[in-house]
Amino acid sequence: MNKCKENRELSWLKFNDRVLMQAKDNKVPLGEKLSFISIFQSNLDEFFMVRIGSLYDQMLFYPSSKDNKTGMTGEEQLKACLRRITYLNKKKDRIYQSIMDELKTHGWGIVKYRDLKNKEDRKYFESYFEREILPLISPQVISKRQPFPFLNNREVYVVVQLESKKGKRKMGIVSCANAMDERMIAIPSMQGKFILIEDIILHFISNIFSKYTIKNKGFIRVTRSADIDEDDHSLEGHEDYREMMETLIKQRRKLCPIRLEVSQIGRAHV
């Protein structure tokens, strides 16, 4: 590796680190700090889709190809990026938690469903789930004999380990996307407090898969590669540039996954 020159991918991650540091700046208002966390995460998603996807393809198909500035192979760049991303994610989690702690002192925050103590609040969200969420979701039960369903890019899914009355294990999956017109719902008895839609779905998941016993549950989120070659031979014959770009966009949606995020509670069975 040429130590006199900075790798493009690592340089970009340093830029995103500077974005993250804005969320730690005491001169920045609390609401804007959360915006910088969101920008950091959106940037990182895009980095995975485009740059990590490209490095992964380079590692597979052109393993001896090297970066002309640093002399790093695709595999070396990929490993260096993933080490840096692990560090940045831990840093982001610490900063986010400090922001949430500060918001709490001002009476604002996100509450887990399991921490709701007020019976009227619980009745409200049970009714909200039945009325506003349940009609919009499409649960799927997956067995070993069935192909795994296609997971859309950057969508949050609830996954559950199911057990039938005969003791057979299956997996259930529910996309939260259709129910997410508003991701946060205000808690009636707690001014400034909110609950996430996906947390409501997770809590009432036994109502969705009522014929099964829930053995484990959690969240997953897939990020798909967006690295597609505009010179791909499959695009030959497209005289209309707009039509060609529409084809490219459709292909991007179905490229291979390059990241799987799993909640702590779901890791045991995913």
Predicted regions: what they are:
Residues 1-267:
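N-terminal non-catalytic structural scaffold regions of very large proteins
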